[in-house]
């Protein structure tokens, strides 16, 4: 099963698939990103034409997920990691992450996980990640005239 898991670097030919998977990631983690698939495709294109690289995880001929890494940051930054819904909780995430770290030759990598994504937090902690910061946001609610309530 996992011996067939392969990783490859994405190209522009993968953008449509990456956009669909990214949309599923946004939905699954209940992110507030409202971009549609076409907007996500264009954003992903911008990523992979800069210091980011996207990686597809394939088991045989089937795509089972992807990762997006910012290679300009030290340590490297894992911006997105997604395993397809129908193969979750079968060990693919663990194997894909370990193979990815080997593929990119990384000993240290950072990531952020949304505080309400308890499944994600549990996965990352089980993989050995440690809490390092608390990322916070203030959304200042203003009336239409620009004055605070």
Functional labels for PLM-detected ranges:
Residues 20-44:
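Conserved GNAT-fold acetyl-CoA-binding loop/helix
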Residues 94, 115-134:
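Conserved active-site alpha-helix within GNAT-family acetyltransferase domains
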Residues 45-56:
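A short helix-loop-beta-strand connector motif used in the catalytic cores of GNAT acetyltransferases and
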Residues 5-20:
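A short beta-loop-alpha structural element at the N-terminal edge
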Residues 87, 91-99:
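Conserved acetyl-CoA pyrophosphate-binding loop and the N-cap/start of the following alpha-helix
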Residues 56, 62-70, 77, 82:
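Conserved beta-strand in the GNAT
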Residues 71-79, 88, 107, 132:
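A conserved beta-turn-beta hairpin within the catalytic core of GNAT-like acetyltransferases
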Residues 104-114:
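Conserved GNAT acetyl-CoA-binding A-motif
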């Amino acid at each position: 099963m996992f011996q067939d898991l392969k990783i490859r670097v994405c190209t522009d030919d993968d953008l449509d698939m990456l956009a669909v998977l990214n949309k599923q990631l946004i939905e699954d983690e209940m992110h507030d990103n409202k971009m549609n698939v076409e907007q996500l495709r264009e954003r992903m294109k911008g990523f992979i034409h800069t210091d980011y690289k996207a990686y597809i995880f394939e088991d045989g001929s089937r795509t089972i997920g992807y990762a997006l890494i910012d290679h300009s940051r030290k340590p490297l930054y894992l911006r997105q990691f997604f395993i397809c819904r129908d193969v979750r909780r079968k060990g693919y995430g663990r194997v894909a992450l370990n193979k990815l770290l080997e593929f990119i030759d990384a000993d240290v990598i950072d990531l952020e996980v949304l505080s309400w994504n308890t499944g994600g937090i549990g996965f990352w902690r089980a993989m050995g990640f440690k809490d390092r910061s608390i990322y916070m946001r203030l959304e200042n609610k203003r009336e239409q005239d620009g004055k605070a309530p």
